[in-house]
Amino acid sequence: MDKRIYLCLAHMSGKEQGFIKEAFDTNWVVPLGPNVNAFEDELKHFVGQDKEVVALSAGTAAIHLGLIQLGVGAGDEVICQSFTFCASANPVAYQGAKPVFIDSEEDTWNMDPVLLEEAIKDRILKTGKKPKAILPVHLYGMPARIDEICAIAAKYEIPVLEDAAEALGSEFKGQKCGTFGTFGVLSFNGNKMITTSGGGALIVPDESTKKQTMFYATQAREPFPHYQHEKIGYNYRMSNICAGIGRGQMTVLDEHIAHHRHVHALYENAFEGVDGITLKSNPDGRFNANYWLSTILIDPVKTGTNYDEVRRKLDERGIETRPLWKPMHLQPVYATNPCYVNGVSERLFNMGLCIPAGPWVTDEDVVYIVEQIKGCCKK
């Protein structure tokens, strides 16, 4: 194949430039303006649940502002999912707090509710206080067992900051991911379901919290004619130009989600009955993943190969793949942090690959990808 097949490239609707041109024509080229307001309104309507949304410079910024508003600070502990990208945990460290890592369960690959409760009890026993927040992730767009996680959080009166950066449009029991916790986080990085070039959003419970979030995101400037600052603030607001890209992307969001699910369905059919290759799919009818990235596990015993050999061979054949996230409790930067593990994430990391699923991936591409994977795995 002459072309290279990528995991998930940005796909423009064709309407983005109109919103950007309007921003230039009206000189709204700053981190506020009509595009920002409209983009936030469109996201609010999409996620539902009477939530408000604040557009920000990154999903990482959204996590950081959520933690700040939950009062996370020096000496606190925040329970974090281990099997995920570092941006979920790093903002905890920004605040001088300590991430406590929880391993995954098999059904969704997300935070294990059983380990979560064990960890809460153990942290209370060892530190004399409960964790300040719980930060589950909907990995690769697969909803976590968020009902169980939220029930445990409510039992111990610990707020939930929900990382739905990879899960825009994913649902659990018909409710959008990112709307279950006190706060929810979205990402619009260049490889996500929609993009604003770079950007993110914080889903908040009400209008007053939205105003407070915007206050922190604009350097915590007080309402004085001069520049008055009584709290530490941040430069986290989204540009009106980037929000224009987001508005154009919102017109094809449903189409993007449908395409990712279609590609996954093709993979599901193609890998059915293939010994040694397991495609990750919804555990049951409560889960409705957006399948931001499709993921497979490669059993080295049954296939006679391993995920890294397959990755290298596919790369030579023009197919981009990526290993699954290396668990945070194995990362050198967090080597001394408390962790509660069951072996699931380490096993997944040593067996798994992300395979192409984005809007540019065609049905013919899927046929080629599957053929190449099967060819790599023949004993």
Regions found by a protein language model. Give the residues of each.
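Structured binding elements
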Residues: 96
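N-terminal "arm"/small-domain region of PLP-dependent enzymes with the aminotransferase-like
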Residues: 1-30, 356
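Hydrophobic/aromatic ligand-binding patch that stacks against planar heteroaromatic rings
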Residues: 90-92, 152, 176, 241
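PLP-dependent aminotransferase class I/II
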Residues: 34-41, 50-51, 114-118, 125-129, ...
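Conserved coil-to-alpha-helix start sites within the AMP-binding
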Residues: 84-89
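Phosphate-binding glycine-rich loop
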Residues: 32-77, 91-93, 101-103, 126, ...
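Active-site phosphate-binding strand-loop segment of PLP-dependent enzymes
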Residues: 107-196, 201-203, 208
